[in-house]
Structures are given as structure tokens and as C-alpha cells.
Amino acid sequence: MSVPSIPIVKQQFSPKFPRLPSSSLYPSSQSQNLNVPSGAFHPISIVHKEVCSSSCKRIWCSSSSSSTAEPKEGHEVRAQVTVRRKKLGVFVSGGGTNFRAIHEATKRGSLHGDVLVLVTNKSDCGGAEYARNNGIPVILYHISKDESNGSDLVDTLRKFEVDFILLAGYLNLYQWNDPSLQKIYIQHSSITSSSFWRQGIHGMKVHKAVIASGARFSGPTIHFVDEHYDTGRILAQRVVPVQANDTVEELAARVLKEEHQLYVEVVEALCEERVVWRQDGVPLIQSKENPNEFR
């Protein structure tokens, strides 16, 4: 979608945490107020691969893991700026299928980042099990009544030098008073009416509500997180038709399939610094192929 009439303000969406000495990169398992399973922290090999960043002046960019990637014939290369590989922290409360999709994308090289840590409030959930099986540190974290801003967790994430927090099926709300801690969140919703996901409806209940409402379309929505539930700026959506004879399970399966693909595409854009902001504060994703196109 071209947006020629509204000026685009290119902003770096890469908050940087204070760098710590390498000896303190991985936090101790005795962190205060953090129940970290023994042996959970294992060094993760970070493979630095060069890609060129997306900017309004750039014509070609490749996120390929190959260092010999070349621009397509007929494309002019005007600028190539190296973008470092991003460090990701993922939060889950359940099966973690979106987390798996993101991690698999990092392994196959289509996503210019690495999952360094998983945070969960349920130690036996599927997402935590997957993380442990893949050598990803797991932090079990429950916020206490006298510690409402999550400062312990913020400090731990800083030690991992996390660039982005990805909430993938994580339902707890923490009011972190830290503007440098950037978060995005995925939520099942009806794209024709945000009321389904702003009433605290989650999981299969949202698909049931969509069908009961008579809505003809549903789909996943990805938005930034603010201090309230489901009120952050929408970053991406995808349309999923609701069939006349859909069951809740059938609709949920189709939405989930699109959700996995959309979330990976959004994280790819974040890692390649292709998220830009209109002057009215609306976030857009810049096209890889044409920097003048946004969606």
C-alpha cells in the first residue's frame, strides 16, 4: 500500500540497554525474586551476519543468511547499512506455538535475530518445555504485590541485552515504567471490531464470540504494548474469512496458521529496522523491495 500523502518519519526502533561486561551477560540463577531453574542459563552462540538496513534512501535489502547475497537484476543499490543481529526475549503462558515459529525462523536464517531468553509464569507450559529442549534460558517469574513495576525482571532482561520483548500468548499485565523496554503483543481478534479483544476475551473464547456475532471476517492483530490491556498501536493485521458453517475449532486453526506467518514477518521487520512511523503516530512496515511502499 502506497502512502504518498502522509509524510513518513523514519525512526530507529532499536532501544539499546546499557552494555555490561561479558562476564555479567548471563545473570546468576540466584537473582532476587526470580525463580530461575538451576542450569537454565547456557551461553548462546550469536552468529553475526550482515544485512543492509531498510531506509527511505535504500533500494535493495536482503535478509538472507548468505553473505554473498546480490541485488536482483535491474535494481540499483544506493546505500547499504549494516544492521546488527537483534536479541529477542519472548514471553509465553501456554503452548508457545508463536514462540516456536519465531525460533524456527531464526534457525533457518530468515529472521535477523536470536531468542536469548524465555519468560513465563507457568513452568510446565509447552513454551517453557520447548525452550529448555532447545537450550534457551527460562525465567519463571511471578510479580509480587509489593513490586508492581517488574523492576527485577527488567534488570534481568538488561543483562541479556534484549532489544525487543515479544509477548506470544502471555496474559499478565506489568506496568513497566521504562520507555526503553519495547514490547509488541499478538492477539486473536476480529479485525472488523476490536471489541472482541478489548473486553479481556482470550483463547478459544474470542473465536466463539466472533462466530456468534455474525462477523464475516476475523484474523490476527499484532500491536505494541502500553500500560493497559490491548490498547497499544496496531502494527499489522491479516484477514481470515469466517465461513458460514465454521466451528470454533476450524476458525481458530485458520487464524492460528495466519498468525504464525504474520508474527514472524513482523519480527523480521523489527530486526531489519523496517518499522517506521507516520507523523500521526501510526506504525507501518516498510517493504523490503520498495522503500516507498508500506503496509
Curated annotation (Swiss-Prot):
<feature type="site" description="Raises pKa of active site His">
    <location>
        <position position="230"/>
    </location>
</feature>
<dbReference type="GO" id="GO:0004644">
    <property type="term" value="F:phosphoribosylglycinamide formyltransferase activity"/>
</dbReference>
<keyword id="KW-0658">Purine biosynthesis</keyword>
<comment type="pathway">
    <text>Purine metabolism; IMP biosynthesis via de novo pathway; N(2)-formyl-N(1)-(5-phospho-D-ribosyl)glycinamide from N(1)-(5-phospho-D-ribosyl)glycinamide (10-formyl THF route): step 1/1.</text>
</comment>
<keyword id="KW-0809">Transit peptide</keyword>
<dbReference type="InterPro" id="IPR036477">
    <property type="entry name" value="Formyl_transf_N_sf"/>
</dbReference>
<keyword id="KW-0934">Plastid</keyword>
<dbReference type="GO" id="GO:0005737">
    <property type="term" value="C:cytoplasm"/>
</dbReference>
<protein>
    <recommendedName>
        <fullName>Phosphoribosylglycinamide formyltransferase, chloroplastic</fullName>
        <ecNumber>2.1.2.2</ecNumber>
    </recommendedName>
</protein>
<dbReference type="Pfam" id="PF00551">
    <property type="entry name" value="Formyl_trans_N"/>
</dbReference>
<keyword id="KW-0808">Transferase</keyword>
<dbReference type="InterPro" id="IPR001555">
    <property type="entry name" value="GART_AS"/>
</dbReference>
<dbReference type="GO" id="GO:0006189">
    <property type="term" value="P:'de novo' IMP biosynthetic process"/>
</dbReference>
<feature type="binding site">
    <location>
        <begin position="96"/>
        <end position="98"/>
    </location>
    <ligand>
        <name>N(1)-(5-phospho-beta-D-ribosyl)glycinamide</name>
    </ligand>
</feature>
<keyword id="KW-0150">Chloroplast</keyword>
<comment type="similarity">
    <text>Belongs to the GART family.</text>
</comment>
<feature type="binding site">
    <location>
        <begin position="171"/>
        <end position="174"/>
    </location>
    <ligand>
        <name>(6R)-10-formyltetrahydrofolate</name>
    </ligand>
</feature>
<feature type="binding site">
    <location>
        <position position="259"/>
    </location>
    <ligand>
        <name>N(1)-(5-phospho-beta-D-ribosyl)glycinamide</name>
    </ligand>
</feature>
<feature type="active site" description="Proton donor">
    <location>
        <position position="188"/>
    </location>
</feature>
<feature type="binding site">
    <location>
        <position position="230"/>
    </location>
    <ligand>
        <name>(6R)-10-formyltetrahydrofolate</name>
    </ligand>
</feature>
<dbReference type="GO" id="GO:0009507">
    <property type="term" value="C:chloroplast"/>
</dbReference>
<feature type="transit peptide" description="Chloroplast">
    <location>
        <begin position="1"/>
        <end position="62"/>
    </location>
</feature>
<dbReference type="InterPro" id="IPR002376">
    <property type="entry name" value="Formyl_transf_N"/>
</dbReference>
